[in-house]
Amino acid sequence: MSGDPSEEELEELRKKKMEQLKEQQGGEGEGQEAAQQQAEAQKQAVLKQNLTDGARKRLNTVKMSKPQVGEQIEQQVVALARSGRVQGQIDEDQMKELLSELTPDSKSFDIKRR
């Protein structure tokens, strides 16, 4: 042995390095997941604080049928609450107004028979 590592030693070093990399990546993924869960919990707390029960039910119904629109509404309500533009709680009528503002007009068409 003249100081050159054998194939077995090289293989062991590679395995150790791969395990270290996997541990580092796993740790970062858990941190991101925890941050996302915390952000979601904060968002839900803000919504619960600023929406009445009726408005919350309406929002949940919209989220079930149109998830993207529901997310937009949630983001809008959170932004309004954080900027201080919400006075009291948003009731069901105000939620209807928000929904009508943020949802695109549905295209309707008439069929005419001759």
From Swiss-Prot:
Database matches in PANTHER family: PROGRAMMED CELL DEATH PROTEIN 5
Classification via Pfam families: dsDNA_bind
Organism: Haloarcula marismortui (strain ATCC 43049 / DSM 3752 / JCM 8966 / VKM B-1809)
Keywords in alphabetical order: DNA-binding
Record-stated family: Belongs to the PDCD5 family.
GO terms for MF: DNA binding
Acidic residues biased stretches: 1-11
DNA-binding keyword on record: yes
Biased composition annotated in UniProt, kind: Basic and acidic residues: 12-22
UniProt keyword DNA-binding, yes or no: yes
Region Disordered, residue ranges: 1-45
Organism placement in taxonomy: Archaea, Methanobacteriati, Methanobacteriota, Stenosarchaea group, Halobacteria
Residue ranges with Low complexity bias: 32-45
Name assigned to this protein: DNA-binding protein rrnAC3180
